[in-house]
């Protein structure tokens, strides 16, 4: 958290943000719905070092989408659920077309940069996947819906229905190479 605080102070107090903040803020649909997350374990974060960042000036022509699925819990996400995800759910998701890129849990530390408020007191597990477009995502959703065996066990852990966010990468996002 100290590194996060330093980085945010340097960025938001720096000349680049000051010069471009109005334009940047106008592109953000919702910047108030923020969860503070950390990788579920050391190897569950994004592996961006394998991605190549597109060159400046590249167009945002990809039809691919990234999907963030948020699972809500009554209590902090425990090792039992993470084991279930890794042993049962992750392979099943991959088999029906949703390779898991990364997965995270709630960071329970206090928000050390109050200028950027975060939602507190929530317990979540968030996993990310990529699809070649909306049709590929719909194919996955149809295929996964047929796995009633997993749905029952998954739902036994959850506080409520998952929240699904469909995202588009910016033209120079490192996620484009995934």
Regions found by a protein language model. Name each.
Residues 1-38, 92-101, 117-125, 130-168:
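An amphipathic, aromatic/His-enriched active-site/gating alpha helix that lines ligand/cofactor pockets
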Residues 41-115, 120-134, 171-178:
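Surface-exposed interaction/gating patches
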């Amino acid at each position: 958290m100290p590194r996060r605080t330093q980085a945010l102070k340097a960025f938001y107090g720096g000349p680049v943000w000051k010069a471009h903040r109005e334009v940047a803020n106008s592109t953000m649909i919702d910047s108030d719905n923020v969860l503070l997350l950390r990788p579920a374990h050391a190897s569950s974060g994004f592996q961006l070092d394998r991605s190549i960042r597109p060159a400046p000036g590249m167009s945002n022509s990809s039809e691919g989408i990234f999907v963030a699925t948020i699972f809500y819990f009554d209590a902090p996400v425990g090792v039992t659920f993470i084991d279930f995800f890794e042993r049962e759910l992750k392979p099943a998701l991959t088999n029906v077309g949703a390779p898991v890129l990364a997965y995270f849990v709630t960071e329970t530390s206090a928000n050390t940069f109050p200028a950027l408020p975060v939602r507190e007191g929530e317990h979540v597990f968030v996993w990310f996947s990529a699809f070649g477009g909306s049709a590929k995502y719909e194919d996955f959703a149809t295929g996964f819906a047929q796995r009633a065996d997993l749905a029952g066990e998954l739902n036994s852990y959850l506080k409520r229905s998952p929240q699904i966010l469909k995202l588009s990468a910016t033209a120079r996002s490192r996620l484009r190479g995934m």
